[in-house]
Amino acid sequence: MNKLHGIELHPTTAAFLAQPRRMLIGGEWVNALAGETLPVVDPADGETFCRVPAGEAADIDRAVQAASRAFESGDWPKMRPVDRERLLLKLADLLEANAQEFAELEAIDNGKIGRAHV
């Protein structure tokens, strides 16, 4: 998908939408345990533009357990505040550097793709 509603998508956005969607749990990209997916529908025309894992209770439990382990015994609680700050600032830099792609994805998800999202 390089275009949506006749609007040329940023190459990174198009590549992202073309990839299979998975969930990040415990540092690994995984499918839903049941293997099911759900359509992500463009509200503007009702067309499916990608599919996402249909996480169920077991997937949620797995994610919560992994997050609890990471928070209680992972690297984050052992980090000095200044090191946490550096990571969060790096995240902010990455979000800013990729703002166009995030804006396109949000516009698509809300059915508002067009010149207004640029």
For the regions a protein language model found, what residue spans apply to each?
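Terminal low-complexity tails and localization/encapsulation signals of metabolic enzymes
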Residues: 1-52, 86-90, 118
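Glycine-rich loop-to-alpha-helix module at the N-terminal edge of alpha/beta enzyme cores
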Residues: 49-117
